Amino acid sequence: SSSQPFYESEKAISEYLLFHYGSSQEQCPHPEGPSEALHYPERCVSQCLQKELLGDHPRALDLGCAVGRSTFELARHCHEVVGIDYSHGFIEHANKLRIEGSLPYRFAVEGNLTQDAVAKVPDEIDRDRVRFLQGDAMHLREDLGVFDVVLMANLIDRLDDPVACLSQLSGLLKSGGQLIITSPYTWLEAYTPSTHWLGGL
């Protein structure tokens, strides 16, 4: 229906599966395209995580994990990874990937044209290190424990009150832990009242 939240829609789920798991060719079939912009969820981990600072059996939290690619990538380096997203649809598909390892889907190419694809977690990643939970980043459950790493990718500009969310992290992030925030900072009143924007005013 038209009242369905975007992040629960089939369109969003398809787009995010492509964004997280699509091949370079599927994401950008044009050779002149910006190839260095592809595979963003992987790059959030490979380029931002300071692996040398991790201790034994590190734990990671992926807040706003969507369909889970960064969560799985964190499992390359962390013993336990928790992915949380507000979207029930995103978490449902992330859990299917955790259990099955792959998931067929269809994405829009142009107009009414679509293409079949398969989202696949890389074989070398231990999916048993990962669990996904539906939850609200603004009101996190109290039994999560503490983490060595907290990743917030493409989340902070979609929160009602970013500062309030960040203030929760003092109880979730170990002393000396890593907080990784990546964002285009596309502030929109539909998600964040302008009085709560962290910039752009």
Description of each model-found segment:
Residues 57-66, 82, 180-201:
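Conserved class I S-adenosyl-L-methionine
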Residues 149-161:
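A short SAM/SAH-binding and catalytic strip from SAM-dependent methyltransferases
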Residues 135-150:
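A short acidic, Gly/Pro-enriched loop at the edge of an enzyme's catalytic core
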Residues 87:
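Conserved SAM/SAH-binding beta-strand->alpha-helix loop
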Residues 34-57:
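Conserved alpha-helix/loop element of class I SAM-dependent methyltransferases that forms part
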Residues 96-138:
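S-adenosyl-L-methionine
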